[in-house]
Regions:
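Rossmann-fold cofactor-recognition segment
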Residues: 41-53
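Active-site loop-to-helix junction immediately N-terminal to the catalytic Tyr of the SDR YXXXK motif
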Residues: 81, 127-135, 147
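A short, exposed helix-loop element centered on a Lys and neighboring polar residues
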Residues: 101-102, 146
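Alpha-helical segment proximal to the catalytic Tyr-Lys
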Residues: 106, 149-154
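Residue(s) in the substrate-gating loop at a strand-loop-helix junction
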Residues: 121
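Conserved Rossmann-fold SDR core element
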Residues: 152-163
Length: 164
């Protein structure tokens, strides 16, 4: 049975994806970052905080896919943003993805057809009002995606999607 790991799988797009993977019969581990425990039959939910260096993942021996989609958006006018706002988005979106990929890569390489999926935003390409922090961090995700796709090819597929 294929094994998938969804970071940020407790709400939004991540939760919908987890349900789709479950319906397709795949074994799925999904992370959440709320203080309450989440339970769902057929899905292994684990607490994981991408900002906590002591938070670790239990990754299966063989992993077929990783989806990195923690939810965070800070919509403010540029003049009200601080360097800390930009740093937090970068830490969650980019450094968190790097950490998860580095932890998962040995298990991904043992799969026949592994895949990593990251999330960007159309705001990177088109520019949206009040999207400075998310556009900056997701722009970095797009660069990371291209770099890792070239580096890991042809064994591991790496893609980013940009929902509107």
């Amino acid at each position: 049975m294929k094994q998938y790991l969804v970071i940020g799988g407790s709400s939004g797009i991540g939760a919908a994806l987890v349900q789709q993977l479950k319906a397709s019969g795949y074994h799925t581990t999904a992370t959440y970052n709320e203080s309450k425990t989440i339970e769902s039959k057929g899905i292994n939910y684990v607490h994981f905080d991408v900002l906590d260096p002591n938070s670790t993942l239990e990754i299966p021996e063989v992993l077929d896919g990783v989806v990195y989609c923690p939810g965070r958006i800070n919509l403010k006018p540029f003049h009200r943003l601080t360097k800390s706002d930009f740093a937090l988005d970068y830490e969650v979106q980019v450094l968190g993805a790097i950490d998860v990929i580095q932890q998962a890569l040995p298990s991904l390489k043992k799969s026949e057809s592994p895949s990593i999926v990251l999330f960007s935003t159309v705001a990177v390409q088109t520019g949206f009002t009040f999207h400075s922090t998310v556009s900056a961090s997701k722009g970095a995700i797009e660069g990371l995606t291209r770099s890792l796709a070239a580096e890991f090819s042809p064994k591991v597929r790496v893609n980013a999607i940009a929902p509107s």
